[in-house]
Amino acid sequence: MASPTSDDSQPAPVRQPAVSNDDMTPSSPTTFRLPPALRYALAVFLVMSMAVSARQAAYYFSHGPMVSDLRIFMTGLDMMRSGEGRQLYRFDAQEAAQCRLYPETPQAGLLPFNHLAYELLLYWPVARLPYRTALIVWAVFNLGLTFLIAWLMKPYTGNLRRVTGIPVALYLLGFYPVVYVFGEGQDSLIFLLLVVLSLRALDHGRTFLAGFILALACFKFHLALAIAFLVFLLPRRWRALAGFAVGGGLVVAISLAIVGPNLAADYPTMLRQQETMTPWGFIPWFMPNLRGLLQWGLSRRLDIGEIVPIILMLSAVIGSAAAYLIWRCWPGQDARRLYSLAILTTVLVSYHLHMQDLTMAVLPMLVLLDLAAGGEFSLAWVTLLLAAVAGLYGYRLTAEPFPVLLVRGCLLAVPLLLLWLVSYKGYGRRPPVNE
């Protein structure tokens, strides 16, 4: 007999929401549909948001390597190709390599590569390309990822698509952080893809694979570990944890092969020193999380020594509340609710988060909107959800008349907190039992 905490020990009375064989859409879809005027208005809003974000991305394409993050990865690639992999996590070596590639670096400031080295293999196809060509090729690749993610999200957006008539890809492209990734040459859409693939694997009962896939996202290990803690450890999914451990071991082994034994000492040292060595990469009020919001909001009244305990305390409250709910409600919740709450909790309590990392908020937004379209929430909660989504989607358009918002990404923590409350409420609801 299986132990009470094994992956296969889900009690019979509580089951996952029924899904049909037709693309896994809910078996009881909503019949409501927005009036044509509202559907067109929503589509126009998303297209406008996409256009404004694309104009900003075009700026990055036309102004060279000093305004985008691709130089971070190109620097790491250059060091690998030139046999300097053993020095990858040394500031002086990276600065020399980046200055060699981009002579303007001393004026703009070093942006060092600080992820596990295995990630550079993803960028290897653009290693020999001129910078602008590499940025364009990487943007096209990210555009393809966007459509792939939209396709993978179809099982979780059936009600939303029926109500609005808008394809999932437009929701993604209308979200500023997604298009921001195109111009920055960043890796956040790869991270989101791996999270969505992990969700799909867990939904299909492939728990080991779900953990293994999520471990491949450990190039942002602080985010991947937090999500794994919430979606695998607390719900006692031991096979998923085993998969995560195997995947984590693989990416560390590849990184060791690139960097050598220096990885064990140099990498933690770089992470400890980076905020001091390159402070321009760690401006808190750029960060759409609790740390950014509180440091920006309290900096005029309190010094940093007084602000940090407040950040830690509020982060602990939110993290503990989510952890307790997940622990208490196990088993019986479907994976989409679990991943949504885990992602939003991770975003809010993370110590280091940039605008491009907010791409992963697309998953909980679309899932919660789909649940609302299916009648899961009361009018009050739907209103709160729509206010949160409007704040997140309207940020970039609002920044047109108020450009200071572009350097106040921390304000996005407010709608994210509202979204977290809705997700918390949605997770606390038991899914319907099918007779």
Where are these regions (language model features)?
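A general structural signal for short secondary-structure boundary/capping elements
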Residues: 217, 260-261, 275-277, 390-396
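Primarily membrane-embedded glycan-assembly and transfer machineries that use lipid-linked glycans
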Residues: 2-4, 13, 19-209, 232-362, ...
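Alpha-helical transmembrane segments and their membrane-interface exit regions
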Residues: 195-200, 221-222, 251, 273-276, ...
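Membrane-embedded alpha-helical segments of transport systems
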Residues: 219-222, 250-254, 380-383
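Transmembrane helices and adjacent periplasmic/lumenal helix-loop junctions
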Residues: 214-231, 350-357
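Aromatic-enriched
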Residues: 369-435
